[in-house]
A protein has these predicted regions:
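Alpha-helical subdomain
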Residues: 2, 9-180
Length: 180
């Protein structure tokens, strides 16, 4: 049931801003933020004292270390927002495979990205393509803005299926809803 979300895993949750929005929206939602230990400390300080902060939990994980475990709970939703574009295709497949291990039969993985091929306007696609060049040449040498077919292939190679694809969210995002 899409309307009965109680337990969310936010992978790469950063400052906890999205997690705070979730707990403010629904008093029955619990969110676990999976991120690096130092990032979780920043998140805890940022959300401290805010209404609903007691329903946000941290799970320390270095996503690139395959022996760093994901939570074993079965989550209703696993959320990755503009996260997978930070990794190579093989790393994306590995991350999605590990996320699938935290999914039950009714769980869904939501992947939100800006795919250059799904943009409404040609100029937006061009800007996203240039962002990819920046990541590759200047930033970390690994990140890039993906064509949606490449991301979908990584997700399906991880053993997941695309249940739904929603384009034109906000200023050009796409959400891929995946299941086991």
């Amino acid at each position: 049931d899409k309307g009965c979300v109680r337990n969310i895993l936010d992978i790469g949750g950063n400052t906890g801003r999205w997690a705070m929005q979730c707990v403010k929206y629904d008093d029955n939602v619990e969110v676990t933020v999976l991120d690096l230990p130092q990032q979780l400390e920043i998140m805890k300080k940022r959300i401290s004292g805010q209404k609903g902060a007691e329903r946000i939990h941290g799970h320390s994980c270095d996503i690139l270390k395959k022996d760093s475990p994901f939570p074993s709970s079965s989550y209703d939703i696993i959320w990755m927002s503009q996260f997978l574009d930070c990794f190579s295709e093989q790393q994306i497949t590995d991350i999605c495979r590990r996320a699938a291990g935290s999914m039950g039969p009714d769980s869904r993985l939501f992947v939100m990205e800006t795919f250059w091929d799904r943009q409404k306007y040609e100029t937006a696609a061009y800007c996203i393509a240039l962002t990819s060049l920046y990541f590759t040449a200047i930033a970390n040498g690994n990140s890039r803005m993906y064509h949606s077919a490449d991301m979908i292939r990584c997700i399906t190679d991880a053993g997941l299926q695309i249940e739904e694809s929603i384009d034109n969210i906000g200023l050009g995002h796409t959400i891929l809803i995946c299941r086991k």
